[in-house]
From Swiss-Prot:
Residues 609-626 have a biased composition (Basic and acidic residues). Belongs to the TRAFAC class translation factor GTPase superfamily. Classic translation factor GTPase family. LepA subfamily. It holds the Pfam family EFG_C. Its main location: membrane. It comes from the Bacteria. It is an enzyme of class 3 (hydrolase). This is Elongation factor 4. It is found in: Cell membrane.
């Protein structure tokens, strides 16, 4: 094991190199990071495991990185020991905000490209972000050990993109470790050292934070100027709070306590604060004894793209859901939430997410880490609605949609960049046209791959657009998108009525052309999920007061003639009339309870394949209650 000589707090800036690894999802960032940890010797061989820096169970199971991880790595080059600050970043489009925060803590970026796949949409997106942050770019082809790798072809693609020679593109294998030592040498040569002022008052940028059940908030910082000591009071310049640090240290690869952190170093600080409002990502940390006067430029707050309601199945868990979201917010700065009430689902929160994967991950973490059983409403985007009387409404939830005549509805748009093999151009064009996309430009990035630019309503992308894109291109296409203003659209609110009563959880804002198909789909789904009652239940879809689709759940019928053996027909008729009158009265007074399982199944965006299983569960639950 290599002994690390550069001690935190006393490391000269000239030997520090802070860099991050950026790439499209599944191009091998975490595997290359594993080899770097192995080569540097900071992780003993017996403790090494795949995806070492992916600490969450979800990350290990799904094979994706969700949280950026910062690690201090020693590396000797030409007899001098250097200190590398490495940040492994996520690759999925939903976690672009994580990547942008990591870039602000670095001077260089390793742009990793899969030698079997070539440049993909998120490769370009991350590259442009790194260029915006003025970082030194080191292009690298990974997975060169695979038989299907085409390093020469893809090296030319990369060279054409960033303006270097194909021979400048490094070739590595995260699996075998080939070329990784050369990559570390290249990082030392190409990435500039930090240029903070070690003698100035301490200034550190908070670029992340996590919640520890025992020690409270763990704040990750990048020191820009000066020095912070473990016995020195610290001051948060943005929120104006002062703390006594319990511990200061670096991550190498586990938390390692140190006496101090100096300019250019990346580390952590624990103040013992348990209140989530006491640590804000993007804030500047300084010494309370010798404070800085000017804070560092922070981050632009992320803007949620998708909204959905989260409701506890057991309403008594509402306070626990609030605490869980507060703690998760520390670890996930892009999550926003406000309390909301639903007639059907009770108390819950309206949550804003960066995309569907982000929404899925938050839901899963709430379930695993905090033991909560939740119902999630269908995802939707925000709309700006102008009513006939001129009143303005910002709608994040279909229940906020104003009644009466609507003058104008404005919906958010995205600029979508799709990279696909040329044989699928027609299929991609059809898909985008079906989703109200407007084509921009199209350019060939190599002889057989095309980058297509579309302007598409965000609402069309947040449901199943990506799945359909993968399906129509046999998995070869990749998608990246970002905000691109707004435009007016012909949208309507579709309400679902059960027994004549609106169920707010099933309401949706859809394009007028798709309103009928949504109404038919939901009424059919609910007909198969809601148990039969003693009276007939109508399920209707409506736009305002106009019914556009209807399904009926037929009544259960008791055989009232079973005890009549022959005899007078008038006796039988009397019993049937009595039953008919009873059912009529029951229909007027009867209240339909929609089971929780039916809500969960109806609000899932998948097909109806599991409806029969859900129905069986509902019946079993009812028998148990009976």
């Amino acid at each position: 094991m290599v002994v690390q000589h550069n001690q935190p707090g006393s490391t000269d800036q000239s030997v520090i190199r802070n860099f991050c690894i950026i790439a499209h999802i599944d191009h091998g960032k975490s595997t290359v990071a594993d080899r770097i940890l192995q080569l540097s010797g900071i992780v003993p061989e017996r403790e090494m495991r795949d995806r070492f820096l992916d600490r969450m169970d979800i990350e290990q199971e799904r094979g994706i990185t969700i949280k950026s991880q910062a690690v201090r790595v020693p590396w000797t080059f030409e007899g001098t020991e250097y200190t590398l600050g490495m940040i492994d970043t996520p690759g999925h489009v939903d976690f672009t905000y994580e990547v942008s925060r990591a870039l602000a803590a670095c001077e260089g970026a390793v742009l990793l490209v899969d030698a079997t796949q070539g440049i993909e949409a998120q490769t370009l997106s991350n590259l442009y972000m790194a260029i915006d942050h003025d970082l030194a770019i080191i292009p690298v082809l990974n997975k060169i050990d695979l038989p299907s790798a085409e390093p020469d072809k893809h090296a030319e693609e990369i060279a054409g993109l960033i303006g270097c020679e194909p021979s400048d593109v490094l070739r590595v294998s995260g699996k075998t470790g080939e070329g990784v030592a050369d990559l570390l040498d290249q990082i030392v040569m190409d990435v500039p050292a930090p240029h903070g002022d070690p003698d100035a008052p301490a200034r550190a940028l908070i670029f992340d934070s996590v919640y520890d059940s025992y020690r409270g908030i763990v704040t990750y910082i990048r020191m820009e100027d000066g020095e912070l000591h473990d016995r020195e009071k610290v001051h948060m310049m943005g929120i104006g709070m002062t703390h006594d640090p319990i511990e200061i240290g670096v991550i190498s690869p586990d938390m390692t306590r140190t006496k101090a952190l100096g300019a250019g170093e990346v580390g952590y600080i624990i103040t013992g604060a348990k209140d989530v409002s006491q640590s804000k990502v993007g804030d500047t940390l300084t010494s309370a004894v010798r404070p800085a006067t000017e804070p560092l430029p922070g981050y632009r707050d992320p803007k949620p793209m998708v909204y959905a309601g989260l409701f506890p199945i057991d309403n008594a868990q509402f306070p626990e859901l609030r605490d869980a979201l507060d703690k998760l917010k520390l670890n996930d700065a892009a999550l926003i939430y406000t309390p909301e009430t639903s007639v059907a689902l009770g108390f819950g929160f309206r949550c804003g997410f960066l995309g569907l994967l982000h929404m899925e991950i938050v839901n899963e973490r709430l379930s695993r880490e905090f033991g909560l059983d939740l119902i999630q409403t269908a995802p939707n985007v925000t709309y700006d609605v102008t009513a006939e009387d001129g009143s303005q409404h910002h709608v994040t939830n279909p229940s906020e949609f104003p009644d009466g005549k609507i003058k104008k509805i404005v919906e958010p748009m995205v600029a979508a960049d799709i990279i696909t093999p040329k044989e699928f151009i027609g299929a991609v064009m059809d898909l985008c046209q079906d989703h109200r996309g407007i084509m921009g430009t199209m350019e060939y990035i190599s002889t057989d791959r095309v980058e297509m630019h579309y302007r598409i309503p965000l609402a069309e992308i947040v449901f199943d657009f990506f799945d359909q894109l993968k399906s129509r291109t046999k998995g070869y296409a990749s998608l990246d998108y970002h905000e691109d203003g707004e435009q007016s659209a012909d949208l309507v609110k579709v309400d679902i009525l059960i027994q004549g009563e609106k169920v707010d959880a099933f309401s949706a804002i859809v394009h007028r052309d798709k309103a009928y198909s949504y109404g038919v789909m939901m009424t059919k789904k609910l007909r198969s999920l809601i148990p039969r009652q003693q009276f007939e239940i109508p399920i209707q879809a409506a736009i305002g007061s106009r019914i556009i689709a209807r399904e009926n759940i037929r009544a259960l019928r008791k055989d009232v003639l079973a005890k009549c053996y022959g005899g007078d027909i008038t006796r039988k008729r009397k019993l049937l009339e009595k039953q008919k009158a009873g059912k009529k009265r029951m229909k007027m007074l009867g209240h339909v309870e929609v089971p929780q399982e039916a809500f969960i199944a109806a609000l899932s965006t998948g097909e109806d394949s599991n409806d029969r299983d859900t129905k069986d569960k509902i019946r079993a639950a009812q028998k148990t209650e009976g």
